[in-house]
Amino acid sequence: MSESTETVASARCAIALGSNLGDSLTILEAALKALAQTPGVALEARSQWYQTKAVGPPQPDYLNGCALLTVTLSPQPLLEALLRIEANFGRIRRERWSARTLDLDLLLFDAVILNTPTLQIPHPHMTERAFVLVPLAEIAPHWIEPISGKSIAQLVQTVDCSEVRLA
């Protein structure tokens, strides 16, 4: 991973946070603090925490939420910062959908559409996931997802939210 410091004037982005190993509430709160202390990142808003069933093999339920950031980092350096924070909280990347101490996903970056080998913006599965859309709609209902052209409030109406409950 490069220690790129590529910057932009200022951008608004949305991230998803999740945890299902360890003291998830403490981990997620500490991750928000770590984000806010990251150079080039300002925490603007955060959702409440939601409990959801895990996707994939049997494992503990997740605690999920979303945050809005104002950043002066471009997308790739921001992703690298998110990955460093995950690693600092003990995240070990194994198989897909495995349990994790901390998962930070870059969902949206202004109206950018980006597809590189290491990063896709918008996040490729965000429009299918109630555990992302419910907390995101709480803090950014009018944000337009650039591929569908729909607001987050519209997108959340297209998924089954019955398994997403306030923690």
Per-segment meaning from a language model:
Residues M1, T7, S162-L166:
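Generic preference for hydrophobic/aromatic residues in regular secondary structure cores
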Residues S2-V41, R46-Q51:
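N-terminal beta1-alpha1 ligand-phosphate binding loop
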Residues G40, E44-S47, T52-L63, L73-L79, ...:
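Flexible, gly/pro- and Lys/Arg-enriched active-site loops
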